Amino acid sequence: KAQDRACVVSEKDSIPLSNVYICLKDRRVIAISDEKGVFSLEKYDSLSLNDTLYFSHINYLHKKLSYGDLIKNRCTVFLIENNRVLEEVSIFSNRHLNRFLHYEILSPLKRGVYSFASVLVDGQIYIVGGSTSCGPFQSNIRSTLFWEKYSNMMYRYDIKQDKWETIRHKFRERAYHTAGYYDGKIFILGGKRLSETRIVDYLDNAIEIYDIKRDTVWTDYTNPHQATLLGSVVYKDNMIVLGGVKKVLQNNEGVYSDEMHLWNLKSGYWYELGKMPIRQAPETILVDHCIYLIGNRNGGGRSIECYNLLTGAWANAGRLLYRLG
């Protein structure tokens, strides 16, 4: 029926009004006007001519109209704009705001180290290797003194006890590497090592495996993904490594990798996983079955890429506010 459809418009300029609520006397909403101001009552064929309809909109005065009057008005409802003057509002707060983020100083390492690999296992943080290099000293007087050294130590930090412990084993001296945890073991791979003269550095092809429960270490020399600053995640029975820097040219520019490899930690077999959309050395994090690549040291990218391990598809997950790399 024609009277089952009606329209709500502004009385001032006859502009259709959307999101007008039409209610019955019991405040039950029976219709909402669409973007053309139109609403339908065809589901309510039991309405009598004396039933009252209520029309409400946040910017207009409420109006009530009988169903009979709605039909007399040719199914058009006019609402008057509600011009309200709001009183001044003052907001007070006794909450003290800090100029800086609050932090707590915890137990320090016995010796400073950076560019190490780390894993979190049962409330304990393991860090291994890293650079202890210093220099150049007193750069204000252009000193040429420089000392480059990589660590061969592993440390364990107990979060609850705020206590550091040194693992008794000596590991390979390496830095800019990665590590992953699986089935009670820590897998350490990638990065670079120094020559005996400490003038030349080499990509480290060795994989070290530390068994936490047995407190033993063994080495595997099968690593097809040799790079520094590589990303890695552990997914189910596999360790997935991505990108990194393969070498550094004489002009100090890095040659970045777009390779991806999957290492099955049960069988020990390696598999090529394809190529990344761009060559990069990203920070990686695993969320469910997706690897998120954040930032990019190759030019300092702002994009966040996502790799779906179930479908093998790449997607752009967003952009950082600032370049990171």
Residue spans of the language-model regions?
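Short, ordered, surface-exposed loop/turn motifs in non-cytosolic proteins
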Residues: 4, 11-26
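A short, amphipathic beta-strand motif
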Residues: 4-13, 37-39, 77
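Short Pro-Gly-centered beta-turn/loop motif in secreted/extracellular proteins
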Residues: 18, 40-50
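Hydrophobic beta-strand segments
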Residues: 20-24, 37, 53, 91
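Short, acidic Ser/Thr/Gly-rich low-complexity loop/linker segments typical of extracellular
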Residues: 28-40
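A short, solvent-exposed loop/turn motif at the edges and junctions
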Residues: 54-65
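Extracellular beta-sheet/turn segments enriched in Thr/Pro/Gly and aliphatic residues
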Residues: 69-93
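Kelch-like beta-propeller repeat domains
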Residues: 84-325
